[in-house]
Amino acid sequence: MQKLTRNHWIGLGDCFGGITTVYCGEKLKLLTIFLVCVLGCQLLRNIEVEMPRPLKQSLDQSRWLREAEKQLRVLENLVDSNLEEEKLKPQLSMGEDVQSPGKGEPLHPNVRAPLSHVVRAATIDLPRLGNKLPARHHLGKLSGLYQMKGCTFNPEWKVPDISDTHFNLDVVNECPSRNWKYLTPAKFWPKSISYFPVQVGVKPKYPDNVMQHESIVGKYLTRLYEAGILYKRISKHLVTFKGQPYNWEQQHLVNQHHIYDGATSSKINGRQTDRRRRNTVKPTCRKDDPKRDFDMVRQVSNTRSRVRPCANNGGDKHPPESGSLACWGGKESRIIKSDSSRDSSAPVDSRGRPKSTRSFSPLSRRKTTGNHHHSSVFPSSVEATTRGRSTPGKSVSPRDSSAIPVRTSGASDKNSPLEEENVWYLRGNTSWPNRITGKLFLVDKNSRNTEEARLVVDFSQFSKGKNAMRFPRYWSPNLSTLRRILPVGMPRISLDLSQAFYHLPLNPASSSRLAVSDGQRVYYFRKAPMGVGLSPFLLHLFTTALGSEISRRFNVWTFTYMDDFLLCHPNARHLNAISHAVCSFLQELGIRINFDKTTPSPVNEIRFLGYQIDENFMKIEESRWKELRTVIKKIKVGEWYDWKCIQRFVGHLNFVLPFTKGNIEMLKPMYAAITNQVNFSFSSSYRTLLYKLTMGVCKLRIKPKSSVPLPRVATDATPTHGAISHITGGSAVFAFSKVRDIHVQELLMSCLAKIMIKPRCLLSDSTFVCHKRYQTLPWHFAMLAKQLLKPIQLYFVPSKYNPADGPSRHKPPDWTAFPYTPLSKAIYIPHRLCGT
């Protein structure tokens, strides 16, 4: 052969194991024909060995067919035992039909046993559903979602440092996006609102420490107010806030409290009163001042301007320390008198504060007989904005007293508290109710930090009940999507926003719908609170707009989820420089970064969204697996567990389930207990199955290779017969033991083909089979079917072209033309994340 190869060139093409084309001399023709016959026969013999024997027409009575008939009867028995109607039917009374399960054996799982054997054992020893009587609320370290350990009050709680998070509106131009029209400002319009009294603003979570709890809540709200996150109520039409005002707030800013004169009467504090006042107040701007029409000062006519004392601010249960303002209907009241001897154009000192400027005279120190009203902003005089405030968009000269804050002096100075800096007064186009819509309480900041408090805001009326709102949906990546968008083999850096929700400003009219109180004062959220379902949607829009600009401007792969940013780049040194530039870019726009939770330098393994992500794989931390195994070991077989506790347990299992060899159908018995709100009891085999899942830990590859194998096996079924056909032309026909629904018969044949042939993919004309959603079937059969068909790909083929359609009707198979398509829905990936 070597000699022949030197003299002549021989080309061998492999087709069905033979030689298709041979170029040789005349003397080699006979030898070539011999080689073709020998090699072809040998390869055909190998094909016959690999091809399933029962699919040959001459081997219908073979051993393979008898084994297939046996497996089919086992599958049919699983279907016919209707688990859903008999053994998993919840019972409302503990009768003879529902007995407490017997004590199972201690958990000694055979780790080497295949998962399929453990699954079959669990279908024999079934878990049980019980009644609604009280049961165990603890499963290891887990407890029911609504039976959690009571919060412990800490009188030494510290209010965390909250900084002013005011992002610059230049971000709209720097980061062009359509999202900004929903964020500048954000709007919140509930259909209907339930208002509550101010006195119930703090939830009685700690009955033994009510006053201390309210005191710390008050400090927390004050800290939020000083950070510019809350409005503070002054009256029905006036609120104050700190920080820099936004553009939409400037048109409603005022420098003092004005009302229009009128003869309208109102009922305040239970008394019918007349709002007409005869005392006039000299305006703070000069008559001939050319800048008196300044955009942030609400000018009112001399003859119609009146200073209106503060109405009740929700603090009538606590008398003020420095005296109270006038009651509208009281006999003896404090009247604010005008002092026309002073001019508002007094000289200004170096700090921008008028020297002994008196626009209003001090209040009389007369005791009142009416109800006391608490006002923290005007304790004994009417104060406007104070020093240190700059007018946005327009410079203010010291001589222009119309824009300079005024304050009282003289007798009232010694009784008034220190003036507040950078305070703005807003008279919006809405009314500010003296009621609340949400309630507050404090808890530990987290399990590792019990020294600082966390404020919990309960606005649940907007997510459930008669006032429930349908909040907009937004794209959130699941595990499958995250695997497909993460780049492979790149160093990564994670960034975390500080106080992310407090970056999102609200429309003032929307803020009036989000009212809270510490029992004395009423506050309204100026920024998005964390207790409203709209806030995550707004934060998603916010970070998505930033992430798109970061990716475009710095040429780096960027992914954002809520307040987390993930940056990836092939060059670690370049990524390190980019991260510093990104932080500087965000900080220049007023967006704060939490450097405690930010990766300082590029790393190859990072923790993101609870997953451990390295260059090529995603996995769950080993500590989490150990905790879950410990919980499963502490399951007591035969005891009833409350459904709320099971709900907590299922949540942990669902998170790790994609990293196991199991499927969601294995958790269906616990889902049945949760849905029907009944007790649940574990069987010994079911507990072993759950433990087996945590032992078969696997890691998921990033950017998995998608293979589209050529289908070689097709299945079809009629109510009485089923068939399996192979692309080689062989087929096998089976008779069912009874008539069932057609989708069940189709699934039986697909499972049988998987057990006996083990193909990489299957053809079926049943959409029920191709979608792999078997929740309506009995649990043990659905679990087995899901486990069998999960690793293979199912293609849908129309019945007209199904190759197995002929054998199921006693006709020959036809593999000449069969158009097929996968029915699995394509995973949605945003355009900017594609191509990585």
UniProtKB/Swiss-Prot annotation:
EC annotation from Swiss-Prot or TrEMBL: 2.7.7.7, 2.7.7.49, 3.1.26.4
Inhibition and activation profile: Activated by host HSP70 and HSP40 in vitro to be able to bind the epsilon loop of the pgRNA. Because deletion of the RNase H region renders the protein partly chaperone-independent, the chaperones may be needed indirectly to relieve occlusion of the RNA-binding site by this domain.
Keyword Transferase carried by entry: yes
Region: RnaseH domain (RH), residue numbers: 704-836
InterPro entries: DNA/RNA_pol_sf, DNApol_viral_C, DNApol_viral_N, Hepadnavirus_pol/RT, Rev_trsase/Diguanyl_cyclase, RT_dom
Stretches the record annotates as Terminal protein domain (TP): 51-250
Binding positions for Mg(2+) per the UniProt entry: D496, D563, D564
Assigned keywords, A-Z: DNA replication, DNA-binding, DNA-directed DNA polymerase, Endonuclease, Hydrolase, Magnesium, Metal-binding, Multifunctional enzyme, Nuclease, Nucleotidyltransferase, RNA-directed DNA polymerase, Transferase
Protein's GO biological process: DNA replication; reverse transcription
Polar residues bias: start-end ranges: 377-400
Reverse transcriptase domain mapped to chain residues: 424-613
GO MF assignments: DNA binding; DNA-directed DNA polymerase activity; metal ion binding; RNA-directed DNA polymerase activity; RNA-DNA hybrid ribonuclease activity
Site (Priming of reverse-transcription by covalently linking the first nucleotide of the (-)DNA): Y146
Region span, Spacer: 251-414
Catalytic activity: DNA(n) + a 2'-deoxyribonucleoside 5'-triphosphate = DNA(n+1) + diphosphate; Endonucleolytic cleavage to 5'-phosphomonoester
Recorded superkingdom: Viruses
Database matches in Gene3D superfamilies: 3.30.70.270, HIV Type 1 Reverse Transcriptase, subunit A, domain 1
Basic and acidic residues: bias regions: 285-296, 331-342
Pfam families tied to this protein: DNA_pol_viral_C, DNA_pol_viral_N, RVT_1
Region (Disordered): 263-417
Function: Multifunctional enzyme that converts the viral RNA genome into dsDNA in viral cytoplasmic capsids. This enzyme displays a DNA polymerase activity that can copy either DNA or RNA templates, and a ribonuclease H (RNase H) activity that cleaves the RNA strand of RNA-DNA heteroduplexes in a partially processive 3'- to 5'-endonucleasic mode. Neo-synthesized pregenomic RNA (pgRNA) are encapsidated together with the P protein, and reverse-transcribed inside the nucleocapsid.
UniProt free text on domains: Terminal protein domain (TP) is hepadnavirus-specific. Spacer domain is highly variable and separates the TP and RT domains. Polymerase/reverse-transcriptase domain (RT) and ribonuclease H domain (RH) are similar to retrovirus reverse transcriptase/RNase H.
Protein name, entry field: Protein P
Organism: Duck hepatitis B virus (strain United States/DHBV-16)
Source species taxonomy: Viruses, Riboviria, Pararnavirae, Artverviricota, Revtraviricetes
Gene designation: P
